[in-house]
Amino acid sequence: SGRRFSRMEGDEAGNIITVDMGGTSFDVSIITGNLLPMHREGTIAGHVFGVPSVEIHTIGSGGGSIARVDAGGFLHVGPESASSYPGPACYNRGGDRPTVTDANLLSGYLNENFVSGDGMKLSRPLAEKAGAVHIAEPLSKDIDEAAGLVIFACEQDMVAAIEDLTVRRGVDPREYIMVAGGAAAGAHAVSIAREIGIKRVILPKMAGVLSAFGILAGDASFGFARNVATTTSNLDEASIRKALAELQAESERFLSGLDVAPEHRSLRWSCQARYRAQVWELTLPFDPADLDAEDPGALLAQRFHELHRSLYQAASEDEDVEITEWNVLAIGKLTDIQLPDISAGHVAKGPAGTRKAYFREL
């Protein structure tokens, strides 16, 4: 979704930070040069699974994240969540602990007169009561300051999550645009971007279902792999060519099984490479035609050094490079989803309403 909406807004560089802030979590992923970052393996609840997946960094910061003050007088937001039921205190469903949503309501970012589709109306008095008991009184602050501190703490956690995937890896987030999704993102995306130095934020109309739209609009794809261990100084070209031929045949069978027209098929090649004695490999893109170069091993090694330097700001160009696995991603481009064009309408003169809002920085 992030890549699609950035292109719709005229971005071709494809350097995108996608964020999704829902009720319980804040998810971050970084797209560089229109390429999705992939994990060779991931973890769920501490359990490692060996299935390649998109690299997503998740923290427990969402609209339902509960704010609390510990025994030492320090404010924390999340990872515990009020969930949908009972939900934030302002939902009037029995919840009595303050959340980010309650803080947004108290700060004027949410309209207390708005009635949701199921008839629910937000309760400011309940949000004030929860905020006063659990945050304002323990910190000796008024309710506006307390709500502002909850929002500030939550946003600082989200800034740190983005920096984990950018600054701490030598990537300058100021060179990226942000595509924000999730039901709660609209209240925080601009503040987060301003803190990091991102100059452009895209908040799609369907931000609340951004992830679901991405699945619906994504292309069909499947990855295949062959293990051929070799080094760039002594490349086993015969075994590699045999493996690539098998991978191409598997890919064509997969795409044919989906009835993907030939003109809508594409193959994305890569290999898993590392310096000797390194524990983790890097995914190195390549083209099968690279094997026809005068010295294909040297070509792959040089590209690996460049990739390593771009990710970690260092490379050992005198070291040999090991390649352990050869991969192909078979992609079948599906019919583009055409979003309806909405013609410009007539805006009524004057604001729909006014309300007080609290901003810490003012």
Regions found by a protein language model. Name each.
Residues 26-30, 65-69:
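Short beta-strand scaffold segments in enzyme catalytic cores
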Residues 95:
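OB-fold/S1-family RNA-binding modules
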Residues 8-11, 47-51, 252:
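Short Pro/Gly-enriched beta-strand edge/turn motifs at strand-loop
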Residues 37-40, 55-68:
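Active-site rim segments in enzyme catalytic domains, especially the processed small/beta chain
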Residues 5, 13, 23, 62, ...:
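C-terminal, non-catalytic interaction/recognition modules in large multi-subunit enzymes and RNPs
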Residues 14-20, 56-58:
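Short glycine-aspartate micro-motif
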Residues 29-52:
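Basic, amphipathic juxtamembrane/active-site segments
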